[in-house]
Amino acid sequence: VSSETLPFEPSTTRSGPRRRSRAESMRDSLQFPLLVWLAHFLITQISATLAYRFGEFRTVEYEPTWTTFVPAWGPDSSAYGMVREPLTGWQHWLVEPFRNWDGTWYSLVAEGSYSEGLSATAAFFPLYPWLMQLLSDITGLPVETSGWIISHLAFLGGLIMAYKLIRMDFSEKIARWSLVALAVFPTAFFFSAVYTESLFLFLSVTTLWAARKNDWLLAVIMCFFATMTRSAGIMLGAPLAVLFIQQHGWDLKRWFPKALLALVPPMGLVIFGWFLTTKDLGFLGWQEQQWQWNRFSAHPGRTFQCVFQGCEETVRGFGGPYEATVHPVSFRWLEELIDNPRWSFITSTEFRYMVGQSQVLDVLVTILAFVLILIGLKKLPLFYSFWVIPPMIVPLLAPSSVFPLMSMPRFVLPLLPLFVMAVLLLQNRRRLAIGLATVSGILLFLLTNQFALWYWVA
């Protein structure tokens, strides 16, 4: 284990110093996450608002061969091409830049649009849009604004609970730097967007914090809600199983009746499946509708072959199966930049679009994540490894013909152990850590700008 790992809880007494220590610990567990949350809010919000005020929406896209550009308007990429109405007042500048891409899907669902005629909505799990709808009904705010508020509050809660969980196994320094690493990660703007990343982070971290404390009732309740938020919620069963066995051993007699609580989290999938059947979308509609994102079945080796070499795959379309060309990772944007390094080109919609479509970010993040996983097998608590391995493997079994590693830079965000492992590697390299955090923060600012103007990021 790491030298920063705490092998046991510090002993305390019943005297005044113990109470002060607890008070100080409580204050620190709130103050530092709040500071990190505020810094993240300022970076992402300033970038998004400036982009919306002074930038222009994407105006091009590739034609099918990916060799030339054709005119296209960014907002047309919204759910079913249904361009959302502009928000008014402060919401136009603060919220509207963060409702793009999947944000339009969640807004559509929040307005009650699970239906056979809009079958792709079945792919979006219900807890987040239901909360959007509930808050909108209470406050009278648009559903997008409700989602924006929920995401920010959930991210603050996620940071607080992440700090508490990390401190159970590591030092204060590791906990603090892990929060910083998470908040300034280049794609961390999704925590501010009308997406499920913040809510899922809060629920998954709270699930494992409760299990780590042997509070299994709270753990399974939080896991149930996580499963109602994203399909990856059911994968929390792996780290929960590790913690349960570590706490109760292999004697089956010691497992019961607590082991019966394991029936609670899967009920999230059962309830959602049943709900979809009432909308004529099928019990497994959330999985069956993945074809609308051009996903196909493959083993991880085939997925990476498509990433680096390109491939041909049969995918389902609205008119039936067809052969799709899967384009490999591209450095065309770099070649173009070397040939034309002028500022006018760097800020052009063509260059920014090429960067977004290149898949370079997908590849770098995926490789980095697996490197951290391998190192973490020796340096992290066992349940940390079981926390991150399943949600990293499953997307490799269902790549998209658009981008084989589509959304991986977003999928890693709630996987807290990856950030803890990165901090452990950098803990004795302060200058390098500060430099990387600075570069990451700059990339966060730039990618937030990209997202706000309808360029693809993850």
Give residue spans per PLM region.
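Specific aromatic-rich, kink-prone transmembrane helix
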Residues: 161-164, 181-184, 199-218, 418
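Membrane-interface alpha helices of multi-pass inner-membrane proteins
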Residues: 183, 187-190, 204-209, 217-244, ...
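Short acidic/glycine- and proline-prone juxtamembrane loop motifs at membrane-interface regions
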Residues: 193-199, 408
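Short hydrophobic/aromatic helix or loop-helix immediately within or flanking a transmembrane segment
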Residues: 97-141
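Transmembrane-helix motifs of polytopic, lipid-linked glycan transferases
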Residues: 133-137, 146-169, 368-375
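Membrane-interface transmembrane helices that cradle and orient dolichyl/undecaprenyl
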Residues: 170-172, 207-218, 248-250, 426
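Membrane-lumen/periplasm interface segments of specific transmembrane helices
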Residues: 43-62, 98, 237-368, 372-375, ...
